[in-house]
Curated annotation (Swiss-Prot):
Heme binds at residue 439. The lineage of its organism: Bacteria, Bacillati, Actinomycetota, Actinomycetes, Mycobacteriales. Its EC number is 1.14.-.-. SUPFAM superfamilies: Cytochrome P450. Gene3D superfamilies: Cytochrome P450. The keyword Heme applies. This is Putative cytochrome P450 136.
Amino acid sequence: MATIHPPAYLLDQAKRRFTPSFNNFPGMSLVEHMLLNTKFPEKKLAEPPPGSGLKPVVGDAGLPILGHMIEMLRGGPDYLMFLYKTKGPVVFGDSAVLPGVAALGPDAAQVIYSNRNKDYSQQGWVPVIGPFFHRGLMLLDFEEHMFHRRIMQEAFVRSRLAGYLEQMDRVVSRVVADDWVVNDARFLVYPAMKALTLDIASMVFMGHEPGTDHELVTKVNKAFTITTRAGNAVIRTSVPPFTWWRGLRARELLENYFTARVKERREASGNDLLTVLCQTEDDDGNRFSDADIVNHMIFLMMAAHDTSTSTATTMAYQLAAHPEWQQRCRDESDRHGDGPLDIESLEQLESLDLVMNESIRLVTPVQWAMRQTVRDTELLGYYLPKGTNVIAYPGMNHRLPEIWTDPLTFDPERFTEPRNEHKRHRYAFTPFGGGVHKCIGMVFDQLEIKTILHRLLRRYRLELSRPDYQPRWDYSAMPIPMDGMPIVLRPR
């Protein structure tokens, strides 16, 4: 039976509490409060063309160098809601790190995601994650993006997903049964989920059988974690030992690993995603180059395991906090039993779908969508010159009271007939993005998350570590529970 070693646990807790950050540094809550009540000098992004009838986008620079980073990383969607209420749907942030325009609300999101006139490019992501996820699918534009997406789509058709599901269920069933600690309030769900989704990705994406190549897989998985966090570095230099430098080194390791794996898998057989991408072609016979596969695999690994980890962690908390929903979901899982899973059986777990939607509404894994204007354009009547970084914020839109009833309340029934609150605006609910760049792995993620929660509910009752427990979130990248999310697993 898995157990927690006290020295390792205490060291982990010390790192979480005492590693300096905007979230745990003494006095930061007071600083945040002061900043929210400080009126900084305002400036215009640019003067609109004479006679255009457009309004200038107005904002401020915030603190020197840091801009509004403290408010953003501590408050996340709450800070954006503050901006939306006080400054409107289009706000300029003259940050020294990344100046840009916040596009707030579902109307702004519709313009950004639909991109009817192709005014918005994915190059807005480049300053943030470009060096680490170079030429990943999300960073490609227009015709080139569609060319790559058509080929990649073959790796996510239903028959392929069925094969991936069989593999991921093998990993989930073993880990949940053997590796997770029971009857212990020190058990942390977030790192356990992260390790599990990395194990799944190692098998389903890279073709490593569980328990094999342990040292190599551990090194590769650590590199993924480093690259994912590097995009939020304040000091962006390739000089050691800074986070940006560590991210660049990790990217180099990943490139070397996948370059070697592609050569192995080009003529091999297998149902893992890497082998599929090596052999997949579109209807015209087009295939990915070796470099394309390396770039796409590095991006897909990041996109798949981080979003799944965030969602599954939030769902575990909500089910522990709301026993009636936990039992409702368990009843559906019990009707299926412990037999092999397939797509059809997971589709019948409808209550888990509702809990998933409500969980990612309240804690949206991908809080923002980056774009950059390719020409002078307008957004909701505001003038945006060419080269402007524009950021939509679905995480904030998912909390708007004009769309969602009691938006901070956990209420999965809002997604059912006749309420259908997510349909009050076409872009009210966009956890997987929208338009031509909607997440290509959305169904894969949903199957993975439901597999994890199904196996978890079949074996355990989930309880909060204490009755009044509520998580605090770190919004420096995808939302992470700062304490690791302690949840007690009670064997049934």
